[in-house]
UniProtKB/Swiss-Prot annotation:
It is an enzyme of class 2 (transferase). [4Fe-4S] cluster 1 binds at C54, C59, C65, S293. It holds the Pfam family LIAS_N. InterPro entries: Aldolase_TIM, Elp3/MiaA/NifB-like_rSAM, LIAS_N, Lipoyl_synth, rSAM. The gene is lipA. It catalyses: [[Fe-S] cluster scaffold protein carrying a second [4Fe-4S](2+) cluster] + N(6)-octanoyl-L-lysyl-[protein] + 2 oxidized [2Fe-2S]-[ferredoxin] + 2 S-adenosyl-L-methionine + 4 H(+) = [[Fe-S] cluster scaffold protein] + N(6)-[(R)-dihydrolipoyl]-L-lysyl-[protein] + 4 Fe(3+) + 2 hydrogen sulfide + 2 5'-deoxyadenosine + 2 L-methionine + 2 reduced [2Fe-2S]-[ferredoxin]. GO terms for cellular component: cytoplasm. Pathway: Protein modification; protein lipoylation via endogenous pathway; protein N(6)-(lipoyl)lysine from octanoyl-[acyl-carrier-protein]: step 2/2. [4Fe-4S] cluster 2 binds at C80, C84, C87. This is Lipoyl synthase. The keyword Transcription does not apply. It comes from Rhodospirillum centenum (strain ATCC 51521 / SW).
Length: 325
């Protein structure tokens, strides 16, 4: 279940000074979620006692996605064992694992008749396998309940626990996503519980195990990185043979989180698409509101078409930039 409203979500940030709230530019304004479909999706998640990253991470696209009955399921509980400076997911002592969660996720996928599903999780450094087995069971449960649904996983780094990546890959998701989140220079303050090159090694390992599996990774911009650092991240991801990169604007969930250094313009985001395509990515989704799972289903179809075109020696059509509409 989602975190109770009266629970302190980020006790480790409680004594930090507040950062000033910045007014968002017009291109980052979104409508409040009010559609009947939004309410139906929310009720289904509550009824099955499931968590979504859409709610827990305060995603700005929740109204649009839930109106379309698209949701990103967050497994392994609602409390994370790490405390990244950018993330709204609650931190602290993690929940007991729900052994029936894989089947509940599969039930929701079948009920919503989803063509493509994204499954992510909190970090569970307390578990022997980091939660990899739970990911694998969830993938298999979805395959059994909705065999026509394509599956994308967005995993933590599993703290380099032996066999964890192999366990997830062997369950055969269609896309394996693991986000770098930001440039390596910013890791000590933005992602202190993780290591940049550990994440790169994880992505490279996925391709070693199964070269046919699509891999994906994303970063946020507006945290103080330079364009040159973004280009270096692109090069590092391509060296790991990553197929698809996402780039979106960082938005501070609360005044206690890392401050927004600047709002990157839509033209700059479009420029990253051009550069990324030139570096060899099959797909680059880059816009102010781009998030890892935003338009994931449509992007998966484009990704598959891009690979087919490349293998056939045809020009790979450049995808349209992801809009905020």
């Amino acid at each position: 279940m989602p975190i109770a409203p009266d629970r302190v979500r980020h006790p480790e940030k409680a004594n930090r000074p507040d950062n000033p709230i910045q007014r968002k530019p017009e291109w980052l304004r979104v409508k409040a979620p009010t559609s009947p479909e939004y309410g139906e999706t929310r009720s289904l998640m509550r009824g099955l006692r499931l968590n979504t990253v859409c709610e827990e991470a305060a995603c700005p696209n929740i109204g649009e996605c839930w109106k379309k009955k698209h949701a990103t399921f967050m497994i392994l509980g609602a409390v994370c064992t790490r405390a990244c400076a950018f993330c709204n997911v609650a931190t602290g002592r993690p929940d007991q694992l729900d052994p029936h969660e894989p089947e509940k996720v599969a039930e929701a996928v079948a009920h919503l008749k989803l063509e493509h599903i994204v499954v992510t999780s909190v970090d569970r450094d307390d578990l022997e396998d980091g939660g990899a087995g739970h990911f694998a069971r969830t993938i298999r449960a979805i395959r059994a309940a909705a065999p026509g649904t394509t599956i994308e996983v967005l995993t933590p780094d599993f703290m380099k626990k032996k066999g964890a990546v192999e366990t997830v890959v062997e369950a055969r998701p269609d896309v394996f996503n693991h986000n770098l989140e930001t440039a390596p220079r910013l890791y000590p303050t933005i992602r202190p519980g993780a290591r940049y090159f550990t994440s790169l090694q994880l992505l490279a390992r996925v391709k070693e195990i199964d070269p046919s599996m699509f891999t994906k990774s994303g970063i946020m911009v507006g945290l103080g990185e330079t364009k040159e650092e973004v280009f270096q991240v692109m090069d590092d991801l391509r060296a790991a043979d990553v197929d698809f990169m996402t780039i979106g604007q960082y938005l501070a969930p609360t005044p206690k989180h890392a401050k927004v250094d600047r709002f990157v313009t839509p033209d700059e985001f479009a420029g990253y698409v051009t550069v990324g395509r030139g570096k060899g990515f099959l797909m680059v989704a880059s816009s102010p509101l781009t998030r890892s799972s935003y338009h994931a289903g449509a992007d998966f179809e484009r990704l598959r078409a891009a690979r087919e075109a490349k293998l056939a020696g045809r020009p790979v059509a450049a995808p349209e930039a992801t809009s905020a509409e």
